[in-house]
């Protein structure tokens, strides 16, 4: 970074801090909102990231709305933080305010299967509560780290299911107007790991509404590995599917455990690439493997397995990055992990190495799944 850029950043940060100091009493006066001293390494499942210029913990939807409106009115950059499971944040001082979602009410209506969860609710708590209550439809999404509010933003999915399968609407704070509105799922343009909320900053999800089955059964299973574990495609009791999914995820290091560095990750780091059929044919010809994972993904397009591509490009489970401080998980090539004393720069170096290796081997560009703040791949 040049001296000029460094000086500009220092001036910007001082200016933002001055503005923030001016509205601090107003934020402190908001019910259920409180300033807290915290680093992003403490807020993310990667245990990486520097220090925001301030952090505000919000324990109600109302406090989220009021804090965001106030920060936006004074043009202070902010980052909404829920479970912190899908964030890659730069080292050092980060010139923004972290707004931490701590509103976590979950309401379940058993006779209709309607579920309403506030954005800060732990996602797997939502799944567990629903399955235990005899509702089906989200059991395949068991064990995914993070908060309920993050699930529609990137249309979270696993084991053949996506949140779009059951999402009715989101309660959204529209930042341009400050209005709170109920947005139907159909208006979110939900697609593979995408919604029109992703990367845009246009709104803050305050809550989600889901429609589940009341018979306690899963939908027919669309993921071969899961169907094999359970013996057939089903339907199966949702509680049985949840147990199987948690077992599969744990075996891949995809259930967060603070004591296990294999789970200090952002989950699946790259999305499965959707490419023209000709590219899929090229990859197959390079490896000479007719059993290559390849799935139809619309007219003339196929979806490839990012984990398979990474492995076939020569990056085995446990492949180490700079100084061994980061590595691919020893259980799954798609998870990039902090081995306990890494920096974000270490992680970015490993991500670039893997991405570049896959491009060199197959001509396929892997796209990262997490949200990047202050750093890029």
Curated annotation (Swiss-Prot):
Keywords of the record: Cell cycle, Cell division, Cell shape, Cell wall biogenesis/degradation, Cytoplasm, FAD, Flavoprotein, NADP, Oxidoreductase, Peptidoglycan synthesis
The keyword Cell wall biogenesis/degradation belongs to this UniProt entry's keyword annotation: yes
Active site (record annotation): 193, 268, 369
Species of provenance: Corynebacterium diphtheriae (strain ATCC 700971 / NCTC 13129 / Biotype gravis)
Metabolic or biological pathway, per its Swiss-Prot or TrEMBL entry: Cell wall biogenesis; peptidoglycan biosynthesis
GO MF: FAD binding; UDP-N-acetylmuramate dehydrogenase activity
Enzyme Commission code: 1.3.1.98
Subcellular location: Cytoplasm
Gene: murB
UniProt similarity note: Belongs to the MurB family.
Function: Cell wall formation.
Catalytic activity entry: UDP-N-acetyl-alpha-D-muramate + NADP(+) = UDP-N-acetyl-3-O-(1-carboxyvinyl)-alpha-D-glucosamine + NADPH + H(+)
Record-linked NCBIfam families: PRK13903.1 (NF010478)
Protein name in the entry: UDP-N-acetylenolpyruvoylglucosamine reductase
SUPFAM superfamilies according to UniProt: FAD-binding/transporter-associated domain-like, Uridine diphospho-N-Acetylenolpyruvylglucosamine reductase, MurB, C-terminal domain
Cofactor(s) in the UniProt record: FAD
One GO cellular component, as annotated: cytosol
Organism superkingdom: Bacteria
Record domain FAD-binding PCMH-type: where: 48-215
One GO BP: peptidoglycan biosynthetic process
């Amino acid at each position: 970074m040049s001296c000029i850029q460094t000086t500009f950043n220092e001036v910007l940060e001082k200016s933002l801090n001055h503005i923030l100091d001016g509205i601090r009493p107003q934020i402190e006066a908001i019910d259920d909102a409180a300033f807290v001293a915290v680093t992003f390494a403490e807020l993310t499942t990667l245990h990486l990231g520097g220090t925001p210029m301030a952090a505000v913990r919000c324990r109600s939807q109302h406090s989220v709305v009021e804090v965001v409106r106030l920060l936006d009115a004074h043009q202070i950059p902010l980052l909404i933080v829920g479970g912190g499971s899908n964030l890659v944040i730069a080292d050092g001082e980060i010139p923004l305010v972290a707004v931490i979602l701590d509103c976590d009410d979950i309401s379940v209506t058993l006779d209709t299967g309607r579920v309403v969860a506030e954005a800060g609710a732990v996602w797997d708590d939502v799944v567990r509560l629903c399955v235990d209550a005899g509702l089906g439809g989200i059991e395949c999404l068991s064990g995914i780290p993070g908060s309920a509010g993050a699930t529609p933003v990137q249309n979270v999915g696993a084991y053949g299911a996506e949140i779009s399968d059951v999402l009715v609407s989101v309660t959204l704070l529209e930042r341009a107007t400050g209005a709170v509105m109920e947005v139907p799922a159909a208006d979110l343009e939900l697609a593979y790991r995408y919604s029109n909320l992703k990367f845009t900053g246009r709104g803050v999800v305050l809550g989600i509404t889901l429609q589940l089955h009341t018979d306690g059964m899963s939908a027919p299973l669309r993921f071969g590995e899961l169907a094999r574990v359970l013996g057939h495609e089903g339907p199966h009791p949702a509680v049985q599917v949840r147990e199987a999914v948690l077992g599969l995820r744990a075996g891949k290091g995809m259930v967060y455990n603070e004591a296990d560095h294999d789970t200090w990750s952002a989950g699946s780091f790259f999305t499965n690439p959707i490419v023209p059929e000709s590219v899929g044919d090229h990859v197959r010809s390079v490896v000479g493997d007719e059993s290559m994972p390849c799935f139809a993904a619309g007219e003339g397009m196929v979806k490839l397995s990012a984990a398979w591509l990474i492995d076939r490009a020569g990056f085995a489970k446990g492949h180490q990055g700079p100084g061994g401080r980061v590595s691919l998980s020893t259980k799954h090539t798609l998870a990039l992990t902090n081995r306990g004393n890494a920096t974000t720069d270490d992680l970015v170096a490993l991500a670039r190495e893997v991405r570049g290796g896959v491009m060199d081997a197959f001509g396929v560009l892997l796209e990262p799944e997490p949200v990047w703040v202050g750093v890029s791949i």
